[in-house]
């Protein structure tokens, strides 16, 4: 019966859920309990995130149309938690492996930085990594999708320096996934073949993009071409395959950046600031927990000086 009710609930036209139609259904069918029934009947067949999206879509409809939302928060949470716990293994994505500095250093051996595409891809890789940014914030989804109000350009790059002389390169992202007003990401000079400053300077020298074009545009035989996410990943996969390395997903760059900064001993709250997280969701991306925590749990006080500096005095 529950399955039949759930099918009936979502077999109606999507504009108005059936339990909100007072002229065609009884009051019983308009009760939020029907939504709980739907979620429970689908638990085990869909991912928890998918069912949560269904749930919140209905709630959004209530908000937009001024209809009272009668669902109790505790009931809603219990239903969604159960659905998430019963999600089939096939609905869960495997954890993405982090890209490491060793991996980037290996890739560098397969790049000819005198070539326009390689110069752009390697600069994009190092900038995305050390700024802990999303790959989509520095690449385009398609060749003709460039919008100067959405995508970063050479004119959006500037430099800042603190009172101690520490210099950082800042990229003003016009708009991001979490902020329509844009956000700033940044990195500092690094020692090694993966230095983002050297890679960016080389890219500017080889490709010489104008100030109002996509930041990592590269010189193609047909003219200046924006770097798309597909082109970026294609070049990374090719280099990885030549080295016999596993092809990593784009989001592995952001995960790898988190891991690298934490392994350097950068405090968790600073890593949150670098990655622009307002909450603790970044903890979901963590890998190698034991290695990260190791310096803080040793029998010898190797982190004592650091702890004294970072911890506030007792009141």
Where are these regions (language model features)?
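Extended, non-catalytic subsegments within catalytic or DNA/protein-binding/adaptor domains
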Residues: 1-315
């Amino acid at each position: 019966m529950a399955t039949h009710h759930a099918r009936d609930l979502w077999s109606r036209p999507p504009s108005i859920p059936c339990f909100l139609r007072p002229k065609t259904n009884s009051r019983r069918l308009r009760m939020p309990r029907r939504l709980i029934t739907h979620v429970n009947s689908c638990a085990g067949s869909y991912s928890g995130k998918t069912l949560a999206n269904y749930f919140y879509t209905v709630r959004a409809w209530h908000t937009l149309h001024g209809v009272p939302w009668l669902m109790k928060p505790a009931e809603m949470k219990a239903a969604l938690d159960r659905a998430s716990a019963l999600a089939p293994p096939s609905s869960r994505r495997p954890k993405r492996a982090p890209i490491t500095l060793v991996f980037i250093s290996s890739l560098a051996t397969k790049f000819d930085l005198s070539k326009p595409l390689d110069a752009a891809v390697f600069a994009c890789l190092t900038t995305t990594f050390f700024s802990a940014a999303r790959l989509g914030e520095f690449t385009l989804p398609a060749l003709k999708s460039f919008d100067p109000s959405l995508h970063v350009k050479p004119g959006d790059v500037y430099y800042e320096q603190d009172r101690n002389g520490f210099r950082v390169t800042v990229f003003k992202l016009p708009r991001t996934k979490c902020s329509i007003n844009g956000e700033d990401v940044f990195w500092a000079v690094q020692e090694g073949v993966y230095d983002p400053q050297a890679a960016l300077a080389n890219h500017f020298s080889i490709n010489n993009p104008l100030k109002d074009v996509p930041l990592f545009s590269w010189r193609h035989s047909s003219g200046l071409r924006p770097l798309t996410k597909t082109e970026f990943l294609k070049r990374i996969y090719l280099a990885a395959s030549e080295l016999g390395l596993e092809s990593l997903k784009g989001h592995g760059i952001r995960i790898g950046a988190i891991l690298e900064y934490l392994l350097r001993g950068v405090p968790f709250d600073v890593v949150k600031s670098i990655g622009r997280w307002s909450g603790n969701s970044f903890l979901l991306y963590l890998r190698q927990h034991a290695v990260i925590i190791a310096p803080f749990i040793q029998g010898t006080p190797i982190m004592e000086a650091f702890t004294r500096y970072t911890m506030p005095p007792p009141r």
